[in-house]
């Protein structure tokens, strides 16, 4: 029933035998009489014979005892549980097992036909149902036997059980400790394999519940609220700028600063109509218009239209002054209100002053004081810097005026040869209000450019 050692040595092993482990073989042989595989389980022979027949038919040449032993271990159903109570207690079982696997005596029933589960698990074993040291072709647990080139030791290089699991079975292959998982099925070499694309199912609308249903509407409403707050804040800032500008003009020119004669390009301000007429014919005013034409790249018709706008504004202001019978001087009641609470002990006197816009300084109406400030180094430097600043501001003001909607309509009439300022009294009053508003907007833009 059992093959002899001579037959096994002729089939499986062709290398010289290791005879230095005779003592350990004797101990293992004595223990195999009590713990043999065929004595403990009756199905051992049947399984071994079936496995031998499978290997003979499928991979002809794997009918040796070593192959049948490993197949019996792999195809055994409940043998680990049946043999768990019959494990060897011999302290020399491991050493004897090593010697048997290293020698050619493969006929010993205790080492070849008994499964690895019936032996004490050595260090490095993964426990029950897992065979240790798979990387050594299942030849033992001792030192690795170095093979010479062209020679084979023991069984074939590939174990039949692995061949069965890889080619004849649909179950996944064994994974040992330290090996990497195979994420894709093995493919033949020189074959382009496209990586499988992971498609994630998008959540359906029916599954969306709660506040997410109106997500788009909420976002749109939030955007509208943000835009509304932005527009409101913009209007508030513009209103504050106009208020500060009015206060500044009130400090400079008094309560009637809106009824003064002004030139928006040259920033000329006066309460005398003769002074403003003189300014419109001055060289300084013409130089300012030429500077605007060069910097803004306007045509001559645009420059002449802007000049006519300033002249028309002057005529409107004159007509309004005649209607209101306005005088630039202050009345006695106004002076009394201003000087209220002032006594002789305070040593305060009312007098006229000269205001220097370039230096932002008030000078007493005295010849010596005015001449001293006129020839001072501070005034000379401030005068040059202020003139350059006025030129830059004039370009910004001209662009703001020409881009106004009302001014655009007038400019179209002006280009057609019509009189753009020939309107009735109602339109004139509304235009004057619009002009004042546009002037305030222009002043706001000038403040932004200064900052």
UniProtKB/Swiss-Prot annotation:
One of its GO terms (biological process) is regulation of RNA splicing. Pfam families: AKAP95 (PF04988). InterPro entries: AKAP95, ZF_C2H2_AKAP95. Residues 235-247 have a biased composition (Basic residues). The keyword Nucleus applies. It is found in: Nucleus. Residues 84-94, 101-118 have a biased composition (Low complexity). The lineage of its organism: Eukaryota, Metazoa, Chordata, Craniata, Vertebrata. This is DBIRD complex subunit ZNF326. A zinc finger (C2H2 AKAP95-type) spans 263-285, 356-379. A motif (Bipartite nuclear localization signal) lies at residues 180-200. Transmembrane segments: none annotated. GO terms for molecular function: DNA binding; RNA polymerase II complex binding; zinc ion binding. The keyword Ribosomal protein does not apply. The gene is znf326. Residues 83-137, 229-251, 413-451 are annotated as: Disordered. Belongs to the AKAP95 family. Residues 413-439 have a biased composition (Basic and acidic residues). Component of the DBIRD complex.
